[in-house]
Amino acid sequence: MRVVPTLAAASLALGAVAGEHVERQLILGGGEVPIGTKTYATGIRSTADGNAFCAGALVSPTHVLTTAACTGFEPPKFVAVGTHYINGTKDGEQIKVVSAQNHTLNNASSASYDFALLTLEKPSKFSPIKLPNPDDSDIVAGMWTKVMGWGDTSYPNGTRSNELQSVGVEVWNNEDCARLFVVDNSSVCAGGAPGRDACVGDTGASLVKEKGQGDADDILIGLSSWGSGCGDPGIPSVYSRVSTAIEWITSVTKVQQV
């Protein structure tokens, strides 16, 4: 478990919440994602075949969106796109990272605008996930979304999952979340159902709105950022709200949202 050193300011507002503040790195209470689906889900690695230490999402053929926190753990050297597994090279693509760029408004002390873009050495053959509308119309409090990653499947003292996992979590409005955490408009909260959460082992995991039968209609709503404890009843996790970063993403990737 990594205690979040950048959230000291946020901790002042957490008197009502028990537990320590941890980077969101676990898929708790979920199930295995079918092989060959959610291929935009990306593992971030130090070596081509090593364990993913963070997650992200393919948002253009040559760019992966993750959290700024993930660029601070250790330098992202490779991404694994379209793979079902936490490590190895038996499926998907392993592509070298040539540069990493944090959001221009990122504030590590408050985890505000917790975004980073990784530029890849070559284009991925997999389809990028759709980005949300910048007017925030794709997010409605009370809707159900899915978060996916390779983090621990139990808490505490869990072990990493070898296979991509996902779990359904409910979106909160920021007013309710602000009663528990210090959040701004670059964040969105989701979760709160007992034992169903993102937690220890996979910061940057995709929070996705499923609109149709297939992955082509999925929309990237958020990226797993931080929280307090894992799977506690009535306590959500905090995600980076992707709709607030569309202009910056477009400026870096040079790809216009269709």
UniProtKB/Swiss-Prot annotation:
It holds the Pfam family Trypsin. GO terms for cellular component: extracellular region. It is found in: Secreted. It comes from the Eukaryota. Disulfide bonds join 54-70, 177-189, 199-230. Residues 27-254 form the Peptidase S1 domain. Its main location: secreted. Keywords: Disulfide bond, Glycoprotein, Secreted, Signal, Virulence. Residues 1-19 form the signal peptide. Glycans are attached at residues 87, 102, 107, 157, 185. One of its GO terms (biological process) is proteolysis. The keyword Transmembrane helix does not apply. GO terms for molecular function: serine-type endopeptidase activity. Belongs to the peptidase S1 family. Secreted effector that suppresses host plant glucan elicitor-mediated defense responses. Targets host endoglucanases and inhibits the endoglucanase-mediated release of elicitor-active glucan oligosaccharides from P.infestans cell walls. PANTHER family: FI18310P1-RELATED, POLYSERASE-RELATED. Forms an apoplastic complex with host endoglucanases in tomato leaves during P.infestans infection. This is Glucanase inhibitor protein 1. The lineage of its organism: Eukaryota, Sar, Stramenopiles, Oomycota, Peronosporales. The gene is GIP1.
